[in-house]
């Protein structure tokens, strides 16, 4: 009987150690869930984890591979089940519900002054909810125009630069000029139309989500919000300068037509350059151009990639120390190069490797100062609003099935009904 009791006690002690992520007198084990997916990025993350483990005997990190495709639901399930990783890789526009729901630790007093001062305040705004900071924004990318350089040179159009971009009306005129004979000036890959539309609309003064003094958010589709949607709609349905078949496509789906000379330009995230370098036919001449500018210049919204700490983690200080290690300037540069994105940190962004003309890194770096928090950044209920209201409404508008008035009505009326449930 005594042996049986002793066995039960030992099992309970072992279970306690496993739950604790390490014994009091042994090494702590942190679980780091990474969403890196490109080979270079996965390699960089795993090498940094190995470097940490080689130099920290008391705190070991276990690399866990996650997926962007299912991260929100996967994290929600793990939070509710008490099985969340200690260090969480995500994007800032996915954090609001988790932060307000109490699933993420407030990092305000956990992060070192070095890291806080290195990342600009506009980036910290993307992970600040209420009085707390619930993630460290570390990688971001502008949306750019990837262009067939030879085609543009032959046409004689003005080539835009970050200092002198095209305006939205100029962009529309140029895509008309580049079109004809079954070819299009632009191919918009808008399988996921909401974030692209809202983020680019900042250049025209669009905001869409408006917060009152009490923190209540409502949707108002105003003149600035209409500039980008109307441009896309008219390029497709009026000018015939944008391919209608790519509206339901992802960015990668447009590349064969781009390489084949069917589209002069494709609006894509800056990181798509990696696929272009890998897949472009030999001798294909391409270049990166800034997105068009509006009343607010080349401003555009971004939702940076983030690193957070689970509220239920028993080792929050150690997790924050690991994040600080990952985001030292040289390490942040490695992560940025691996993901073909821009670092948020000022020291990392100044690295010469990110200002070279090769693969147009310099063009992207020149746009970094104009990146702002995405309009949907602080909106509770945004995932449901996006999936149930905004995505079908924008898709139908871009295809010509509905007009601008109905788009406005659905975004505002149906959208505010959804958001109201999250603000009771």
Residue ranges and their predicted role:
Residues 2-97, 270, 295-296, 317-318, ...:
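Conserved N-terminal structural module of periplasmic/extracytoplasmic solute-binding proteins
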Residues 50, 54, 155, 234, ...:
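Extracytoplasmic/periplasmic substrate-recognition and gating elements
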Residues 85-86, 115-151, 174-176, 185, ...:
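A structural signal for short loop-to-beta-strand junctions that line the ligand-binding cleft
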Residues 92-144, 200, 285-289, 356-358:
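Hinge/lid segment of periplasmic solute-binding proteins
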Residues 105-119, 161-164, 186, 206-228, ...:
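Short, solvent-exposed loop/beta-turn-alpha elements that line the ligand-binding surface or hinge
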């Amino acid at each position: 009987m005594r042996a049986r009791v002793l066995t039960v006690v030992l099992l309970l002690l072992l279970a306690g150690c496993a739950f604790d992520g390490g014994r009091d007198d042994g090494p702590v084990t942190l679980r780091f869930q990474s969403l890196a997916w490109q080979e270079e990025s996965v390699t960089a993350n795993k090498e940094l984890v190995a470097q940490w483990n080689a130099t920290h005997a008391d705190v070991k990190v276990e690399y866990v591979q996650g997926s962007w495709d299912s991260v929100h639901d996967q994290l929600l399930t793990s939070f509710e089940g008490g099985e969340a990783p200690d260090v969480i890789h995500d994007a800032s526009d996915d954090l609001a519900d988790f932060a307000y729901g109490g699933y993420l630790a407030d990092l305000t007093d956990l992060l070192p002054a070095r890291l806080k001062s290195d990342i600009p305040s506009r980036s910290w705004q993307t992970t600040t909810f209420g009085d707390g900071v619930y993630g460290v924004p570390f990688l971001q990318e502008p949306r750019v125009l990837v262009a067939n350089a030879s085609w543009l040179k032959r046409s004689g159009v003005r080539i835009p630069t970050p200092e002198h971009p095209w305006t939205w009306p100029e962009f529309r005129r140029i895509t008309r000029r580049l079109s004809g004979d079954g070819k299009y000036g632009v191919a918009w890959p808008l399988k996921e139309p909401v974030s692209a539309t809202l983020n680019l609309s900042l250049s025209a003064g669009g905001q869409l989500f408006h917060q009152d003094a009490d923190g209540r958010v409502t949707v108002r589709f105003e003149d600035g919000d209409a500039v980008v949607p109307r441009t896309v709609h008219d390029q497709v349905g009026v000018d015939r300068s944008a391919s209608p078949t790519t509206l339901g496509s992802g960015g990668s789906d447009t590349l064969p037509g781009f390489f084949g000379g069917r589209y002069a330009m494709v609006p894509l995230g800056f990181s798509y350059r990696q696929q272009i370098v890998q897949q472009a036919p030999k001798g294909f001449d391409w270049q990166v151009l800034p997105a068009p500018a509006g009343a607010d210049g080349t401003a555009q919204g971004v939702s940076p990639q983030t690193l957070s700490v689970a509220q239920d983690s028993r080792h929050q200080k150690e997790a924050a120390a690991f994040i600080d290690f990952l985001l030292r300037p040289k390490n942040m540069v490695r992560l940025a190069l691996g993901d073909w994105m821009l670092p948020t940190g000022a020291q990392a962004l100044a690295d010469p490797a990110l200002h070279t003309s090769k693969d147009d890194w310099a063009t992207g770096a020149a746009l970094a100062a104009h990146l702002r928090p995405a309009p949907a950044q602080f909106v509770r209920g945004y995932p449901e609003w996006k999936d149930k209201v905004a995505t079908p409404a924008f898709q139908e508008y871009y295809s010509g099935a509905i007009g601008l008035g109905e788009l406005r009505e659905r975004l505002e009326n149906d959208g505010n009904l959804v958001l109201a449930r999250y603000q009771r």
